[in-house]
């Protein structure tokens, strides 16, 4: 199944994005991924990862504890995100989609949240001076390289998060798991510390430990 929306909707998204861009301050670390040649096998794999595009399914968990842990994470992250996204349903849908797309790409949700914070400040229609778009500041050339060529659709929440996660996963693979270098490549500043340090610092704000899943501490022994 391919990610498709009617052309009219894409035009509407483009107009909304343009208006939003005029109202937004410049983005300090906005992405500017550099277009590089892709091997046919890499292009095919990334296109396949992008193209498997049904909306996030009903989440399934191995057991009730895993589901309850996810719900606790969702509640905690929603509370943290409230100041940046005040509308409750939009906030929950964003977090559900980000969790799904992060896990699908083998990424830590806290890392992706940190990247979104640095890249766009959680603004759906953010546009950088280099033309990067949306939450994860995806460059338009990616729509041509691994998508259907319609860069306007990069403003759609799930599409933007999917592209961003697939691209970051690709850069991690290229850099053989070196997160520092992969983040620099994502931002077009490979080898420089400012951007990776900003994302890794932001990740700490979104890290979460499920206290309910921790083993209870042993009772203190009493002297006799």
Task: Give the ranges of each region predicted by the language model.
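N-terminal secretory signal peptides and thylakoid transit peptides that target proteins
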Residues: 1-18
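Residue-level detector of alpha-helical hydrophobic segments embedded in or interacting with membranes
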Residues: 20-21, 50-52
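Catalytic glycan-binding domains that act on GlcNAc-containing polysaccharides
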Residues: 32, 53-224
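Onset of an N-terminal alpha helix
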Residues: 39, 43, 71-74
